[in-house]
Design a protein with these regions (language model features):
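Helix-rich interaction surfaces within compact, conserved domain-sized segments
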Residues: 149-210
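Hydrophobic membrane-insertion alpha-helices, especially the h-region
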Residues: 20-34
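Surface-exposed, low-hydrophobicity interaction/linker segments
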Residues: 58-119
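C-terminal region of N-terminal signal peptides and the immediate post-cleavage residues
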Residues: 32-51
Length: 210
């Protein structure tokens, strides 16, 4: 309280504006943390990274024969380009998950005829998931029903970076492959396929739009 006859002193800058500046700093900090949290979330439709359990799994030098209990990480065989018909060492899994490939990949789609491994490996490099099937090895479902289910699944996922293709040399009914990852089973399991797509699609070493 200022008594009569006293000169009233003007408040200093910090005394006058200090509380306002403090509140502003808190608001800016909160906004920054919120934006950082949003940036760390995957965008809608974007594939999430493989689980840490699979990443920590030792890479297998030889591919699984017969059904697996889940995705198996394979040893990387490189990404060398070769010419059509050019010889190369054998792939370490059936179907392959990395290695020698042609310069031109296949378009996404549901195919009625097999596609050369050397073409499909290029798709894997671009982050594709390839669903291979062999009707002779299927259990619990007919071939026509499987094809219809896979076509519907392809359309459900809008066909982005997915190829469905028959593979007569496959030793199981269905095989899922992505770059360095393989999963094989005999009975159609849509949730298993969708989980594989969610985890491993668009995880190849070359990032492309299609």
């Amino acid at each position: 309280m200022v008594r009569p006859g006293q000169v009233r002193q003007r408040p200093g800058f910090l005394q006058q504006w200090g509380p306002v500046l403090a509140v502003g700093a808190i608001v800016i900090l909160a906004l920054g943390l919120g934006l950082r949290g949003l940036g760390s979330q995957a965008a809608p439709g974007q594939a999430t990274a493989p689980t840490s359990a699979l990443s920590a799994q030792p890479a297998s030098a030889e591919g699984p024969t017969g059904p697996t209990t889940g995705p198996v990480r394979m040893a990387n065989q490189g990404a060398a380009h070769i010419q059509p018909g050019q010889a190369h060492p054998p792939y370490n899994s059936n179907p392959p998950t990395s290695g020698w490939h042609y310069e031109t990949p296949a378009a996404p789609g549901v195919y009625d005829q097999p596609i050369a491994d050397e073409t499909l490996v290029h798709n894997l490099e671009h982050g594709y998931v390839i669903i291979s099937y062999n009707c002779a090895r299927l259990e619990g479902i007919g071939c026509d029903e499987l094809k219809a289910n896979l076509k519907n699944l392809f359309e459900l996922k809008r066909g982005w970076k997915i190829i469905v293709v028959p593979r007569p040399s496959l030793d199981t009914g269905i095989a899922l492959t992505a770059w360095e990852v393989i999963d094989k089973f005999n009975t159609y399991d849509q949730s298993r396929i969708e989980d594989f797509i969610a985890r491993f699609r668009d995880q190849g070493p070359e990032k492309t739009q299609s």
